[in-house]
């Protein structure tokens, strides 16, 4: 399975998610958010992973990069390529699908227990620790 990972240049390491995907035999291509003109195409890509970022989709100054990533989401959806977003990546998917992303009145940071009744094995392993 080939995964396209989109992240910021200095922070494009897929971390524990990448470790787990590698353990099950997935391979990666990487696109750096700051350079959408240099992005690899979706040809042969089975899954898109949008990593977190210090950016927000509503920030001024990164509109072109956000628009390029929104286009990538739309193209992946049209081709039936699954998309997984982490933090900023999830914001971007919501934005691309017409949702609103706004600044919170107060910061929200914390760790929460997550469980799945439908797919209990998906949460096992070090990648979600």
Predicted features along the sequence, with ranges:
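Extreme N-terminal starter segment of soluble prokaryotic enzymes
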Residues: 1-4
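Flexible gly/pro-rich beta->alpha loop and the following alpha-helix that scaffold active-site loops
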Residues: 18-84
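Catalytic nucleophile loop
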Residues: 75-100
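Short N-terminal binding/cap micro-motifs at the start of the first secondary-structure element
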Residues: 11-16
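Conserved beta-strand edge residues that scaffold enzyme active sites
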Residues: 34-35, 90, 108
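Pocket-forming structural segment of enzyme catalytic cores
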Residues: 97-129
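Cofactor-binding loop segments of dinucleotide-utilizing enzymes, especially the Rossmann-like FAD-
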Residues: 6-8, 33, 88
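Short coil/turn segments
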Residues: 9-10, 106
